[in-house]
């Protein structure tokens, strides 16, 4: 009754409701509330999903084609450890093959912290990872001793964002996008290294051809300049690299004013599908 009578009522959901048994129904129910109560497309309302935002798109590191085409859902990786060769396309949703040939024996987890506390059954997952005859090696790269890092055979400590140069966009900032040119405010401590250095060293040990293919002969700073130059080529309104570095923060308002979810349905009463 309170939700139905409140105007506006801002209704949104995070990333938790669907992470449980039949959680997709919970997610759908939350999304239905603003539709039923007339809170879609009004000031202060929302669509029931995560809020939208205007952002300045950044250029990310190019990825080579993955030669491995077989895929499983992100939720079934524990099954792939325990009974990988038994998993099939029909029963378990394996993609790219009729069945898995081998179980998961190695996990590389970068800044994820999803090994334990974002899975459905912590105790079951704990027991699976305790058996080193199953998943034999876990590598975790992070800034903190997370729950996932505690299960790692090898922990590689990454640098924090305040310890290295980078360009990052806004996350959820509403109707104004921005770029921040990060500059170190403190020197790296102890033996921690940036992820690009870590991956470059791994590539180097796989062979000089792999190292060259991965780095393309660029340092981390050279990659940053190269990727930003591609951004400027697509968006000439952006300041130059050196100007952005001097500014620190570049802001831009949404040229359309604001984003309206299901705009066609709200303005011309088209049905929401």
Regions found by a protein language model. Give the residues of each.
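Long, low-complexity segments enriched in small/aliphatic residues
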Residues: 224-273
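Conserved hydrophobic/aromatic pocket- or pore-lining residues that grip, position, or stack substrates
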Residues: 33
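Non-catalytic alpha/beta scaffold blocks inside enzyme catalytic domains
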Residues: 1-23, 27, 36-42, 49-57, ...
């Amino acid at each position: 009754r309170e939700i139905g009578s409140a105007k506006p009522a801002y209704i949104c959901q995070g990333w938790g409701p669907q992470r449980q048994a039949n959680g997709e129904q919970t997610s759908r129910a939350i999304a239905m509330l603003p539709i039923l109560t007339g809170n879609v497309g009004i000031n202060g309302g929302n669509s029931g999903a995560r809020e939208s935002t205007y952002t300045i798109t950044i250029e990310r590191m190019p990825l080579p084609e993955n030669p491995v085409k077989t895929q499983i859902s992100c939720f079934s990786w524990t099954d792939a450890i325990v009974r990988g060769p038994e998993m099939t396309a029909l029963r378990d949703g394996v993609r790219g093959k009729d069945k898995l040939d081998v179980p998961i024996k190695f996990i590389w987890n970068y800044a994820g912290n999803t090994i334990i506390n974002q899975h459905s059954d912590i105790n079951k997952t704990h027991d699976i990872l305790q058996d080193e005859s199953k998943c034999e090696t876990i590598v975790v790269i992070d800034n903190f001793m997370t729950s996932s890092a505690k299960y790692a055979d090898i922990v590689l400590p990454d640098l924090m964002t305040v310890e290295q140069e980078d360009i990052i966009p806004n996350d959820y900032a509403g109707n104004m996008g921005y770029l921040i040119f990060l500059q170190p405010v403190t020197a790296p401590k102890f033996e921690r290294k940036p992820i690009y250095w870590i991956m470059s060293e791994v590539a180097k040990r796989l062979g000089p051809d792999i190292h060259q293919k991965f780095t393309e002969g660029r340092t981390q700073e050279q990659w940053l300049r190269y990727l930003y130059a591609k951004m400027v080529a697509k968006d000439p309104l952006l300041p130059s690299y050196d100007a952005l570095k001097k500014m620190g923060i570049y802001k831009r308002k949404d040229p359309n004013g604001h984003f309206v979810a299901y705009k066609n349905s709200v303005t011309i009463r088209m049905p929401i599908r």
